[in-house]
Amino acid sequence: SLHDALPILQNLHDEDMQDQLRNMLKPFYGVLKTMDGAIRFALLTGVTKFGKVSVFSDLNNLMDISMDDRYVEICGITEKEIHTCLEDEVRELAGAQDMTYEETCLRLKECYDGYHFVENSIGMYNPFSLLNTFARRKFGDYWFETGRPSYLVELLKHTHYDLYEMANTETDVDVLNSIDSASINPVPVIYQSGYLTIKDYDPEFGIYRLGFPNREVEEGFVRFLLPFYANVNKVESPFEIQKFVREVRFGDYDSFFRRLQSFFANTTYEVIREQELHYENVFFIVFKLVGFYTQVEYHTSKGRIDLVLQTDKLIYVMEFKLDGTAEEALQQIHDKHYALPFASDGRKLF
């Protein structure tokens, strides 16, 4: 496993450093070409695919199997393999967590399944997280914690990228397969780093729809984003979401909105220039995280966000407007009949 990616990705917009790093890597990989008579078989993984100037230009005898459907199961664990080879471990985990066998299987699937490397392929479980879960007999964000994606966050902020769009993006095979240091599109980097995967495919136009593969990646990545976008430090960040959820569950909407407002304090000039996108990104992060513990429907359009948030006992219908008053937002809720679907619901409506 040759992880060349990090130094190059951390200097993605420094062309001089990119050239230096490529010139270091090319002779390293070139040895595989000159010594191919002594190598019967080699499998290279963890290698980033860059466009224009490749570190493999001297190594033309490689076969790229990244999106070859014959090899989709080569670097992960299938559900069938879990039940064939790891059945005892599943039952031991269920016992340790006081869960049924069925509940344990569903939780494993939710947390660690979902990787698709070509269209219409079988879902693959993350082997690192899966095996660590069995070894420790407890669920955890094992893969995510091996490397925090600071360079991806900097790339997203550098390109002023819409996080909602990132989590629901559409692209083609050429974009997925090559990272261009001159491009402002962060999606190929995020995809090749394992934080996005193929969710759907349109064969007519050759378009892939991407998304987060599973809960470990989605919650870990979005939670990691919070202190980079909102006015909250990294230590307090996990507790802020916990407080959010409690306030929502108990109907303490005054505290909820005060906490939300505090996230926008001390906004920098750079952020003010991209104010609408910044607000949308913070809302996306907050309600994405709250949505792991409550039911959230989130829609965004030019200058406004519609939100329905449901708990066991309460329903919140919200309208956020960038340029407008609270009265106008409330009038929009009334005029558009946003609360109508809940008219016969027994829960308290805000």
Model-assigned labels for residue ranges:
Residues 2-6:
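Short, small-residue-biased leader/transition segments that mark boundaries at the very start
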Residues 326, 330, 339-350:
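Nucleic-acid nuclease catalytic cores
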Residues 18-40, 338-341:
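Substrate-engagement module of ASCE P-loop NTPases
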Residues 1, 27, 35-52, 56-60, ...:
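A short beta-strand-to-loop transition that corresponds to the Sensor-1 phosphate-sensing loop
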Residues 51-58, 65-132:
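Amphipathic alpha-helical segments of the small helical/lid subdomains adjacent to P-loop NTPase cores
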Residues 7-21:
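Conserved ATPase-coupling elements of RecA-like P-loop NTPase cores
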Residues 7-10, 51-57, 326-329:
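Switch/connector loops and helix/strand junctions flanking conserved nucleotide-binding motifs
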Residues 62, 123-328, 335-337:
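Extended alpha-helical interface modules used as scaffolds for assembling large macromolecular complexes
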